[in-house]
Amino acid sequence: MAAATMALSSSTFAGKVVKLSPSSSEITGNGKATMRKTATKAKPVSSGSPWYGPDRVKYLGPFSGEAPSYLTGEFPGDYGWDTAGLSADPETFAKNRELEVIHCRWAMLGALGCVFPELFARNGVKFGEAVWLKAGSQIFSEGGLDYLGNPSLVHAQSILAIWACQVLLMGAVEGYRVAGGPLGVVVDPLYPGGSFDPLGLAEDPEAFAELKVKETKNGRLAMFSMFGFFIQAIVTGKGPLENLADHLVDPVNNNAWSYATNFVPRK
């Protein structure tokens, strides 16, 4: 890493040294230095991977055509599709890539949170309210909201208190991520590793590169799932498992097309 940094800090042109980046003394100034490290570029994956490089899997397979020149297959989830040109600018691409990964992770957690309470309730586990779109409103009931139906865990009775806790907790987590940890030493805020990888899944570079692709693919699917859950909540007012059960009982009358053509906003 040190050798790479030195190589990037200077170069030669016509026999003269040309400085490409400031020295450490120029950065520190009056003795003040930042511990934050910038994220490195994605390490190249072996040419045998079907998910990276110019010969990677494309969005339409053999009918995809030529991918844009700026989509080189360097990052996970790059299928060579960017009709709107959203990734043409490198800075915009880096920002959108970070936003996508973060939203993928939240969507995967959200999808689990929408499905599993309803699944547990259908199998005898008691919840105050298992349907995700109705669970939050329990805080306005007379007894308040008990987490996991247990008043000894968290007994919430104030929406303002819950909001304040959410702001503090989420702000702390997001601040930790953006700042690169308490000392700013995290190299890549998207894949920090260390204590965030207790199982050591990132130790093998090849396996880690494939896990990044799986995360992106499952995250995109989860975002579409959450969008579907939102639409279902607006149209039917039911949870995803109840909607699935209704569809399996009567698929002709309980499907997206029948609801779209006969939709009347619920009162």
Swiss-Prot record:
The cofactor remark states: Binds at least 14 chlorophylls (8 Chl-a and 6 Chl-b) and carotenoids such as lutein and neoxanthin.
Where does the record say the transit peptide is?
A: 1-35
Sorted alphabetically, the Gene Ontology BP terms of this entry are:
photosynthesis, light harvesting
- UniProt keyword annotations, A-Z: Acetylation, Chlorophyll, Chloroplast, Chromophore, Magnesium, Membrane, Metal-binding, Phosphoprotein, Photosynthesis, Photosystem I, Photosystem II, Plastid, Thylakoid, Transit peptide, Transmembrane, Transmembrane helix
Key word Nucleotidyltransferase present in the record? Answer: no
Q: How does it sit in the membrane?
A: Multi-pass membrane protein
What InterPro entries does this protein map onto? Chloro_AB-bd_pln, Chloroa_b-bind
Q: How is it modified after translation?
A: Photoregulated by reversible phosphorylation of its threonine residues.
Under PANTHER family, the record lists:
CHLOROPHYLL A/B BINDING PROTEIN
**Protein name according to UniProt:** Chlorophyll a-b binding protein 22L, chloroplastic
Taxonomic source organism: Petunia sp. (Petunia)
